[in-house]
Amino acid sequence: MKRLLLASVALLAAGCGHDYARSAAQIPVAPTIAAQPLPQVPNPPAPVAAAPAPQVAAAPAQASSRTDYSVPANWLCKPGTSNNPCEVNIDATIVKADGSTELQKYAGNPNAPIDCFYVYPTVSLDPFTQSDLVPGPEEFNVVKSQLARLGSQCRIFAPMYRQFSLGALRARMSGGAAVPTRGTPADAAADVDDAWAWYLANENKGRGVVILGHSQGSGQITRLIAAKVDGKPDQAKLVSAIVMGSTVQVPKGADVGGTFKSIPVCKTASQTGCVISFSSFRDNVPPSETAGFGLGRGETEAVCTNPAALGG
């Protein structure tokens, strides 16, 4: 079961960094979605391209308010919720190396023996610095494309959180006009912490859990794991940590240390309690020396695990 879960991470490798290498043969590349519309939000803004992981400034110590995760509406995906975007038809067309295709039917497993706790990337189109807790098409679409297929291996928990919005990130990176302030940067971290605490107290019941995120979500789970899991009793529950489009550091030549003090790098598909991390770039455009992710710093190097072949 755990081997299958780690192997299923290969599905994420097709597009969860910040630039896209050529896809390996025989992976799902064209989902075949049945006519099953996602929940609608009035007047959704036009879709925009994904952006790199934000390097968010140091947050104030206090959140502007706390979020109650006993309220089902504050979860994007959670077992038993209505209009769950992680429970849609995600049959896919497999394109093989010889060009032939095969329809891969998908079936979720509500009785999966482990859980997945996911924090999504920078996608919010809200016109303020911090997003609200009302999901829009952008949040629905990212969990459908990145996360939902793991529902065949784990129960999925994905909280809404007051993330640093895409508009705020663009303004910061371009030097353009700032977007209006709402809340504080500490709101995002407080939400992720509170969602994790509620999940542990009410849903975990001693089950193994995969903690995964992408981009801004990876920054949040890295902080969460370092503070709440690494070297703590809950580390025993960790099936794996999957940190995509961000950087986990280890001492050069080592498998443990650096970002996490006692959680090693995953080396085999059957290994548990370990971390998978990667950022993808075009094969002919490696990360520059000024890249915000994918590079080592000083005496450390960036973890770079191939999720489709953990043995190297």
Write out the residue ranges for each language-model feature.
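Post-signal peptide N-terminal segment of mature Sec-exported envelope proteins
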Residues: 21-61
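Sec-dependent signal peptide recognition
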Residues: 2-7
